[in-house]
Amino acid sequence: MSNTAYIGSGTTLSSKYYLRSFYRSDREAGTSSKRREFSGNQLALADGRALRKAVRRLTSSDFSDDQGTNTRNSVLAYIQTYNNMLSSAGSSSDRTLERSAKQLKNITSEYSSELDKIGITVNDDGTLTSRTTLFESADLSKFKELFSADAAYMQRTSTYAKRFASRGEALVTSDNNLLMQKKMPLPQVLPQQTAPPHPVPQRVRMTALPPLRHRSYPRVWIWIPS
């Protein structure tokens, strides 16, 4: 399958083009060599968003013969996105993500026979692999049965992809809030001011005064002539 995009009449777009468009909000998360730079929760959010975009792209396809190459290339990008989502869920300890991924694997397993008819194998670990010869030669009507807007497989996948993305967003928001709290300076604690110690009252020694003694003085008479 060609990975070259030809712009013009009857434009053919590569699977890499579709993969980049699915990861447009988190472009580097769609690149294998860059995924290690993301946290598990960031990957879960990116993969959930990308899978929802992949579903929207596939369900908007007309599955006509002149768009056969684009349809197949978009399905190849869907397979990569789906596998990325299972990978990020597998490395997460969050039970909600694990449950959503498990449900998606169960749904895909239910359609393993239909997928096999267009050259897509559901592996034991739940991931998907395309078998080139059958994938490129299978009738587009069989692709439509699985990936059109009316297909139950896409409708059910869309539901759990949305849950996966919503949970990833909540986890990333929580991580960012914790990071902000760690970066905030701690409030300065002023030393507690204590009142000066009260002076210890000094004991006053009381000394008894001697009793007053009354002294008698001789009377003096003054004569004043009239």
Say what each PLM segment does:
Residues 1-226:
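Polar, low-complexity export/assembly segments characteristic of proteins
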